[in-house]
Structure formats: C-alpha cells, structure tokens
Amino acid sequence: MSRTIAAISTAGYGAIGVIKISGNRSKKILEELFKSAGKQRIDSDKWQNKRLYYGTIEQDNRVLDEVMAVYMKAPHTYTREDVVEIYTHGNAVCQRRILDAVIDEGAELAEPGEFTKLAFLNGRIDLTQAEAIIEMINAKSEEAFDLALQGLAGQNERSIGNARVRLQEILVEMAVNIDYPDEDIEEINYQKTIESIEEVIDELDEVIDITRKRRVYRDGIRVAILGKPNAGKSSLLNELLMEDRAIISDIEGTTRDVIEEQILLSGIPITLIDTAGIRESDNVIEKEGIDRSYKAANEADVVVYLIDSTKGPDGEDENVIKRLRADSLVVCFSKSDLPMSAKNKENKGLFDKSIDISIRNKSGMEELKSELRKIAEEKNVAKTEGKRDRTVYEATKAKKSLNEAKKALKKGLSLDFAEVDVKNAYAYLGNITGDTASEEVINKVFERFCLGK
C-alpha cells in the first residue's frame, strides 16, 4: 500500500503557511480534521474537486487554526495522487501543530523532495523537469528563473525525446537489416542514416548549449579581491555592491577578515570576497587574516589582484601572484586617476593584460564587469564538461557514441558496429530523462530538494 505523506511546504514565518498532503488517505485525513464555517464535518461525497473551503482544523475538540483547505482529486494533481492543501496562518508553531495532527491521522512525514519525486515516478514530469523545479526555487535572478521555467515547460525533455525517437527509428531499421539479411526488404541507406544521426547530434548540441547557459545563471562564480594593504580592495567591493559594506581607511591593515557579498551582473550571480591586505607582518591577528586571504583566493574561481598605480608592481606582488592557484587572474591597477611615474608605467608592462580602474571617477568599472561576465560564462562551460552537470555529461557521451557510429557507417563496416554505438547513445539520453537512469542517480537529483516540495 502506498504511503500518504505530508509536510509543511512554506519556509519560516509569513502571513500564510501551507501544509501539503499526498496519497490515498489525503481526503480522509481532511474529513477527520476539518470543520466548515458552520462547525460541521463535510461528508466524503460532498467534497468538490479543486474548490476552496473555509473553516477550522480541530483535534480532540480543540481548534488548531482558522484555515482554507482544498482537495484535489487524482490524477490531475502535482503528484498524480489525491492531494490536499491546508492554508494556515504562517506561524511555525501553528503549522507544526496541524502537521502533527495530520500525522496522527495516518500520514507520514515526507522526505525532502518526495512530492516532486512522486510526480516523476508517476510520469507527470521527467528528471530534466525535476531539476528545473529545484533551479526555479533557488534562482537568484530573473534570467535564471526564466531559463528554469523553460526547463520545467519541457524544453530539454522535448529535444531529448525527439532525439530518442529518431534513434529508435534508426535502431529498428538497423535491426531489420541485421536480423533478416536474406528477406525481401529495402536495404538500409548508409548516407541517409548518417544524415539522421547528424540531425540528432545537432539537437544534442542545442541541449548542451541551453544547459550550459542555465548553469551560468544558476551558479555564477566566486571572485576574490586580493592585493597589498590600501590597494583599494574594500573600495572596489563597495563600488561593485553600490553600498558601504566594507570599512575604508588610510590605515593599513584595516580589513582583518574575509567579507563575502553577492551581486548580479546581467543576471549572473557573482560572489565577491574582500580580503585582508597581503604583506609581511609580525602581528598574529593580521597574519591570520592574510592566511585567510590566500585560502579564499585559492578557493575562488577568479582572483582580481589590485595594484596601486601610484606605487606600481614590485617583487612582492610577483611573489603573491605566483602563490595563487586560481585558474583566472585579472590584474587591475587602482587609483588610475592619479599620476603614475615612468618607472611604474614600465613595470606595468610586465603583465600581458591589465585593467586601469578608478573608484573616484568610476573609470574601468564597466571593463572589469565585462571581464567577470566573460569569465563566468567560460568557467561554467568548463564545469559542465565533467560529471557535475548530469545533462551535459550524458549528452556529450551520446554525441561521442553517435560520432563513432557515423565513422563505422562511412567506412562501410557491418551494421553491427554502428548499432552498438547508437544503442549506447539511446541509453545515455534515457539517463537524462530518467527512463533508464539508475536509482542512485534518481535519488541524487531529489536529495537537492527541501522539505515540502
């Protein structure tokens, strides 16, 4: 017998809280706890599908809250099971009491993501849409939300589905020619099969591009701002944030700890990390701050290294840069509105590329932002190449198999060789939608969800 599950679907405090119940006992539980405005129980056959009812939730003759409630009949629900939603006041104590009452009536506490997992298992959505739901919940910008919404609408699902249908047609044609070589059937046309495979590859390229774009707007990058004391790190942080977040002072070593804040650049989330100025120091507290600066820099995707234009780069700057493990380095010369000596101009040429910035007159800021946006896009493309992004990983493997199938067909080899690769590609695409994904993969997708979703 299937479980009836329940959870609080809203987070924290607010005007309204939502208790969600799914399963074949949902309606029965509502009948036991809900009383209409006239203090009457509603008979089972009187509950209307998707109608909102006003009343109270009561247990042991005690009113728990004044609520609105709705019963939604399967299969036209989020989980494709009978679903009940109870709209309570948003106080956490009130919501907890009602959830406890629901559990007392036979429901079980839902696991994180279990409602959406039911939607997947019952065929309402596929794995790509489940991932789009979690991206919508966590979206930090309008661009990220819109891209996730396209995913929920089945953008990748349709593309992958179309690709699998085409591969299935190719496999059927191959199987007939392999299994019945002596029968009076039309011989497979290698060139047409190659063209069909190329069409599938083109479709997969689109899926990969869309997924990479979604990742850029979903994950963004971490940017550590590094440099000597008084190079202008905190001023740069405040300028990018457009608020006075970090203390600015002419006294060296003012910033002793790491400060993290987030901004959006054209919808891309950028985590900015202001660090303590790096120099030789005997001060125990300052040395700890400097160690944390290096740690933050080496864990970041990008380091923006600031050099005071009026002082120019020296051997100490070179030593610091050599210690950095960050993949991307952006060298900026701060205070560019002030005069620079001929020697400093000469030393500046030691760097292949640098950006002159001035917080006072705002120069160079757009160039720096543009560079960070560019790096964010490149970084997230690189990240999707590995197993970290399931869709890109599986689609790339499918492309590789299809290219191997093309090679075999172009060489005129037996269809058996190409068939193996096409079958592999078909299975890889099934892993994306969940049709052939392992239980472990499915569980990992839903582990990312919160309670009540």
Positions of PLM-derived features:
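A glycine-rich (often HGG/GG-containing) alpha/beta subdomain
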Residues: M1-D146, Q150, G154, V330
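C-terminal-of-GTPase-core extension/linker across diverse P-loop GTPases
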Residues: R3-A11, E142-L264, S281-N283, G312-K453
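Inter-motif core of Ras-like GTPase G domains
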Residues: E286-T310
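Switch I (G2) and immediately adjacent beta-strands of P-loop GTPase domains
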Residues: Y53-D65, A69-K73, G253-S281, E299-V302
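Short glycine-/polar-rich loops that comprise or flank the Walker A/P-loop
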Residues: G14-I16, K50-L52, E299-V303, A326-L329, ...
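Conserved G/P- and acidic residue-centered "switch" motifs that form tight phosphate/ATP-binding loops
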Residues: G123, N230, D274
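Generic enzyme active-site microenvironment
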Residues: L272, L306, C332
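Conserved nucleotide-binding/hydrolysis micro-motifs of P-loop NTPases
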Residues: N24-S26, K73-T77, N91-V93, I125-L127, ...
